[in-house]
C-alpha cells in the first residue's frame, strides 16, 4: 500500500466545512441566511490567509443508541439527533484503523493494533454473535489460529444459510479530504460465521457462493477513518458542533451509506469503534498552480443505494420515486484559503419503465403503469427540492424513436409540477452534437446560464464563514445516465469552476481553464476518470465518448474503444449482470425477507450455459449443412439432408430469438412483469 500524504497546508480547508445528514423523511425547514452579492473585483476579498485546520479527535469512546436499520439514522437538525449529543464530547470517537484477525476454530477475534483500545472483538463462527473480550483464547498445537491483518469491518451479511462477516483485507490511499486520509477498498473477504452441518445446508451454501464472490468483487468503495464521505460540504457546514460529535455512522447520509444494512448487527452491539461508513462512487484529487496560485480540486461521486443495480436490471424509478443510477457529484475547489463546492446529480428518468435484456443489441423500452408516472415523478422531484432546492432537469435523450417515446412520457408527466423552482429542458444530444461536435453543448449552457448564476455555489472564506450557499442543482439524464450525461456534467462543472476562479482573482475576467494547458489536461482527466468509475459500476465498462471529456475532441482510438466497450456491455448485460444484481440486492438488504431456500436455488443450468448449447447446435448444423451441400454435387440426396440441417439451424435461431429472455442471466431475486 502506498503511503497517503496529508493535504498540503495551502489545500487544507477551514474549520467548519462539514455537512448535514438526511434520511428518507423530510428535513426540518430552515431559512437560509442572506447571501451577500458576489465580489465585483477579480481580486479576492481582503483578509486572505492560510486556512486553519482543526482536526476532530476523540478523547474517549462514545456509545451510541442502537438502531434497527439504516433508515432510522437521525435527521440533521432533528431533535433526536441534537439530544443525542447533549452530553457528548465535541468530536466523534476514533475508529480502528488496523486489526489483527485471529481465526480460531470456534470464533474470529479482531485485535486492535492501533493502540486505541485494549478490548478485542470476538465473533462466533457458529452463529455470528459478537462480544468484546479482554484477552485472546488459549492457544495450543490443536488450536493454532491463522493470523492476518485487516483494515476494518464492513459489516455482517445475513443470509438464509447463516451470517458472513465482511472485512477489508487491502486498501489503497487515494488522497485526502479536508485534511483526512481517504482510502479505496481493494480487497474484501467474506468470513462464514455459521456451521453447515447437513448436506442440505452445504448445498445451500454452495449456491450462495457465486453471490458472495460477486459481493467480494464490489468496486468503487471508499472510506475515511476520520471524516464522513457521505456528506456534502454545504450540508456538513450547517450541522453544528453537537451533531459532529456523533459517531461517523450516525452522521451519515443513509442514501449514500453503501454498507448501511451490513452495519446493523454492529450497531445493535454498540460497537462504535468498528462502525466504518463506506460509500460507492469515486474520489479524486488534483493539484495545480495557476498564475502562482495553488488550486486544488476534489471530485467525489456518491452512488445512491435506494435503487442500486446494473444497467439493464435497474431502470427508471420505483413507486417511491427513487431513481436508478442516481449519483451525486460534488466538485470542491480550494485556493487562496477559500473553499467552494458545487453539487449536481444524475439519475434515470423518474417514472416506472424497464428495458429487460433479450439478446437483442437494444432491447425495447416498456413504460409500466402509465397512470402512476406523474405521481412517481412528483415524489422524486419533491425529494430533490427538499435536499437541493431548485432543480433544472436536463433530458439528453433522442426526440424520436424508442427514446423519443420515453422523452414524451417524461415531458408530459413533469408538466404539472413545472415552476420557477422546477425547470425542464430537453436537449437532443445526438441530433445537435452528433458523434463529434460536442462543442455545440454551448447551446445548452446558454439555456441554463441564468439559472446557474441565480442559484450560485457554496463558498467559505479563509475564516470558515459562509459567504453564500448553493440553492439549486442540475439534474442530468440520458438513457443510461453515463456517456452523454458525463459529457454534459463536465461542461457544467467547468463553467462553475471558471466562475469561482474568476471571482477569487485566480483567473482574469476573460480567462478560461483552456488558457492553461497543464491545468486543462488534468481537469479533463479528472472528469473522464469520474465518468469511467460511475459507468463501470453501472454497466461494467468505462464511459463511451470518454475521449472528448479526456482530450476535448473525438479521436479514432476513442471511437474504437467505444466499439469494444459497447460489445462488452452487450455481453455483461445479457450473461453476467443478473448475478451481479442479486449480490447488490443482498448487500443492501433489499430482499432480506425473501432470501430463502425456495428462491435461492434456480434448479436449472445457467443462462450462459444454455446459450452456449444453442450456439453450438447452430454452428454444428451449419457445418453439416455445408458438408452435405458439397456432397450434393455427386448425389442429389445430400441436398435433402442439407435442407434438413438448414431447417434445424433456422429453427434453433428462431427459437432463441423468440425466447431470448430465457437465455439471459436473470436476477434470482427480481421478478419483472414478464
What are these regions (language model features)?
Residues 20, 47, 61, 398, ...:
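Residue-level marker of positions within ordered structural domains that often coincide
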Residues 73-467, 496-674:
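Phosphoinositide system proteins, centered on phosphoinositide phosphatases
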Residues 9, 27, 31, 37-38, ...:
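Enrichment for repetitive, rod-forming helical segments
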Residues 1-81:
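Low-complexity proline/serine/threonine-rich segments in eukaryotic and viral proteins
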Residues 3, 8, 39-40, 165, ...:
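Generic low-polarity alpha-helical segments
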Amino acid at each position: 500500500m502506498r503511503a497517503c500524504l496529508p493535504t498540503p497546508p495551502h489545500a487544507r480547508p477551514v474549520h467548519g466545512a462539514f455537512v448535514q445528514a438526511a434520511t428518507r423523511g423530510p428535513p426540518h425547514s430552515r431559512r437560509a441566511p442572506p447571501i451577500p452579492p458576489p465580489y465585483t473585483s477579480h481580486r479576492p476579498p481582503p483578509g486572505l490567509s492560510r486556512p486553519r485546520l482543526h482536526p476532530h479527535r476523540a478523547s474517549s469512546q462514545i456509545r451510541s443508541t442502537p438502531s434497527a436499520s439504516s433508515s432510522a439514522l437521525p435527521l440533521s437538525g432533528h431533535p433526536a439527533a441534537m439530544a443525542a449529543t447533549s452530553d457528548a464530547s465535541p468530536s466523534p470517537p476514533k475508529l480502528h484503523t488496523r486489526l489483527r484477525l485471529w481465526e480460531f476454530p470456534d470464533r474470529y477475534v479482531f485485535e486492535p493494533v492501533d493502540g486505541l483500545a485494549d478490548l478485542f472483538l470476538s465473533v462466533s463462527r457458529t452463529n455470528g454473535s459478537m462480544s468484546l473480550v479482554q484477552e485472546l483464547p488459549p492457544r495450543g498445537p490443536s488450536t493454532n489460529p491463522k493470523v492476518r491483518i485487516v483494515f476494518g469491518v464492513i459489516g455482517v451479511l445475513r443470509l438464509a444459510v447463516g451470517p458472513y462477516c465482511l472485512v477489508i483485507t487491502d486498501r489503497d490511499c487515494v488522497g485526502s479530504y479536508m485534511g483526512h486520509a481517504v482510502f479505496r477498498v481493494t480487497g474484501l473477504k467474506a468470513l462464514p460465521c455459521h456451521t453447515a452441518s447437513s448436506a442440505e445446508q452445504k448445498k445451500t451454501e454452495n449456491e450462495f457462493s457465486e453471490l458472495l464472490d460477486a459481493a467480494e468483487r464490489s468496486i468503487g468503495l471508499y472510506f475515511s477513518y476520520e471524516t464522513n464521505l457521505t456528506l456534502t460540504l454545504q450540508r456538513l457546514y450547517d450541522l453544528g458542533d453537537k451533531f459532529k460529535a456523533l459517531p461517523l455512522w450516525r452522521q451519515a447520509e443513509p442514501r449514500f451509506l453503501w454498507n448501511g444494512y451490513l452495519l446493523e448487527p454492529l450497531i445493535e452491539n454498540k460497537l462504535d469503534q468498528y462502525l466504518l461508513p463506506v460509500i460507492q462512487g469515486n474520489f479524486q484529487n488534483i493539484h495545480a498552480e495557476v498564475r502562482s496560485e495553488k488550486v486544488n480540486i476534489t471530485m467525489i461521486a456518491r452512488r445512491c443505494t435506494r435503487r442500486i443495480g446494473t444497467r439493464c436490471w435497474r431502470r427508471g424509478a420505483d413507486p417511491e420515486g427513487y431513481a436508478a443510477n442516481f449519483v451525486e457529484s460534488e466538485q470542491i475547489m480550494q485556493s487562496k484559503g477559500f473553499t467552494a463546492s458545487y453539487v449536481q446529480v444524475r439519475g434515470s428518468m423518474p417514472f416506472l419503465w424497464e428495458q429487460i435484456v433479450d439478446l437483442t443489441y437494444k432491447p425495447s423500452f416498456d413504460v409500466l403503469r402509465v397512470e402512476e408516472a406523474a405521481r412517481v415523478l412528483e415524489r422524486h422531484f419533491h425529494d430533490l427540492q427538499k435536499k437541493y432546492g431548485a432543480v433544472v432537469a436536463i433530458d439528453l435523450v433522442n426526440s424520436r424513436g424508442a427514446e423519443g417515446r420515453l422523452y414524451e412520457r417524461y415531458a408530459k408527466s413533469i408538466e404539472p409540477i413545472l415552476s420557477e423552482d422546477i425547470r425542464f429542458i430537453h436537449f437532443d444530444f445526438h441530433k445537435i452534437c452528433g458523434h463529434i461536435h460536442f462543442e455545440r453543448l454551448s447551446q445548452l449552457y446558454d439555456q441554463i446560464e441564468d439559472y446557474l448564476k441565480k442559484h450560485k455555489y457554496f463558498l467559505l472564506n479563509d475564516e470558515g464563514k459562509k459567504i453564500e450557499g448553493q440553492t439549486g442543482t442540475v439534474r442530468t439524464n440520458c438513457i443510461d445516465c453515463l456517456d452523454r450525461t458525463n459529457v454534459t456534467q463536465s461542461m457544467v462543472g467547468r463553467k462553475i469552476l471558471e466562475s469561482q476562479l474568476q471571482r477569487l482573482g485566480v483567473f482574469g475576467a476573460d480567462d478560461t481553464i483552456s488558457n492553461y494547458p497543464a491545468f486543462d489536461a488534468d481537469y479533463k482527466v479528472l472528469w473522464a476518470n469520474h465518468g469511467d468509475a460511475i459507468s463501470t459500476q453501472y454497466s461494467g465498462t468505462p464511459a463511451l465518448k470518454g475521449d472528448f471529456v479526456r482530450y476535448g475532441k473525438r479521436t479514432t482510438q476513442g471511437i474504437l474503444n467505444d466499439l469494444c466497450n459497447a460489445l462488452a456491455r452487450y455481453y455483461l448485460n445479457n450473461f453476467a449482470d443478473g448475478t451481479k444484481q442479486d449480490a447488490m440486492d443482498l448487500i443492501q438488504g433489499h430482499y432480506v425477507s425473501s432470501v430463502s431456500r425456495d428462491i435461492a436455488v434456480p434448479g436449472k443450468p445457467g443462462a450462459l450455459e444454455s446459450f452456449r448449447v444453442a450456439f453450438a447446435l447452430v454452428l454444428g448444423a451449419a457445418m453439416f449443412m455445408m458438408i452435405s451441400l458439397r456432397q450434393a454435387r455427386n448425389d442429389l440426396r445430400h441436398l435433402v439432408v442439407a435442407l434438413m440441417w438448414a431447417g434445424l439451424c433456422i429453427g434453433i435461431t428462431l427459437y432463441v430469438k423468440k425466447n431470448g429472455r430465457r437465455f439471459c442471466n436473470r436476477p434470482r431475486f427480481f421478478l419483472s412483469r414478464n
